[in-house]
């Protein structure tokens, strides 16, 4: 598996609800463990809650937080929900950064079924981005600061997404509350277009997976890419 002091690799998914991100993440974990590759817990990333003293005491972190704030102020109207997603995106960024520099977990692969990019798209959901170029530049800036992160763009047919969402337990996300399929399809198409506009210029090098296939087949493709391009022995 290469050098023992290598930073962990992080796989981060983004895409429509019902795309099968979580299911595919579990399939990847299973394949990696069968190959005796260490799968690192994402708990330290997901559960990380930044403290404002982290921003005050570190100029680097403060400068990065300002980038997230700039992105927030490019979306109208500013709401509590958008602020929540801005802080969530920053939490993921800081969690990944700390995960890499802590030195406690090395030589393995960590899988996030959603993360920074998903939070940025959610922050702009049904809002007006006053300057898309600047918004995308904010995302690109913070993404480029991270090492060893593989972004997976999950494409899905909206009708399959609807079918999977309807099969979930009730009380899910915002879109799952829409009961009319035609209205839900319309909202998914809007979000799909938003994903494309926001990510096509800001997330360089992302791999695109068509999630209409079975999770195991998609997991195999991602594992092959991960091992071949980003986790090969030195």
Question: For the regions a protein language model found, what residue spans apply to each?
Answer:
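ATP-dependent small-molecule kinase phosphotransfer cores
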Residues: 46-127
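Conserved phosphate-donor/acceptor-positioning beta-strand/loop module used by diverse small-molecule
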Residues: 112-115, 145-168
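Hydrophobic anchor at the beta1->P-loop junction of P-loop NTPases
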Residues: 13
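Short beta-strand-centered segment that lines the nucleotide-binding/catalytic pocket of NTP-utilizing
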Residues: 35-51
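Conserved lysine of the Walker
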Residues: 21
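NTP-dependent small-molecule kinase module
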Residues: 162-234
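Walker A (P-loop) phosphate-binding loop of P-loop NTPases
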Residues: 18
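Hydrophobic positions on the alpha1 helix immediately C-terminal to the Walker A/P-loop
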Residues: 24
